[in-house]
Design a protein with these regions (language model features):
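A short beta-turn/loop motif at secondary-structure boundaries
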Residues: 62-64
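Glyoxalase I/VOC metalloenzyme domain signal
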Residues: 2-55, 66, 73-115
Length: 115
């Protein structure tokens, strides 16, 4: 989903396995999970948040994009996780595609697969 320049991700964890989405949102519940910020210094941002007492929850690479990310559990203070995401042209292209698809959306077919 998109609201102006803000992308809104609606995430529904499936399966039984533990994951970062269920760490703060119990199964069967609906809640706000995270805010995401672009960063040019992922390691530095992680180190800064960890030095403030926050726990690193997950790291990874967005498939096919070259972008790396981290989730830091800031929920004890902020009430939600914080995602840090490095910039890449491919990930920017994905976000631009989502924004463009939202411009003339008529409200039908809200659940769609990407790719």
């Amino acid at each position: 989903a998109q609201a102006g320049d803000m992308q809104i991700e609606l995430i529904e964890p499936t399966g039984e396995q533990a994951n970062i989405y269920r760490d703060t949102v119990p199964e069967g519940k609906t809640a706000f999970h995270h805010l995401c910020y672009w960063t040019d210094d992922l390691d530095g941002e992680i180190a800064s948040l960890v030095s403030q007492g926050y726990e690193l929850a997950a790291t990874g690479t967005v498939a096919g994009s070259g972008a790396t990310f981290a989730y830091v559990d800031t929920s004890p203070v902020l009430g939600h996780m914080t995602e840090l995401l490095t910039y890449s042209d491919d990930i920017k292209g994905l976000f631009d595609m989502v924004a463009a698809a939202s411009i003339n959306w008529d409200g039908n077919d809200p659940k769609r697969q990407l790719g």
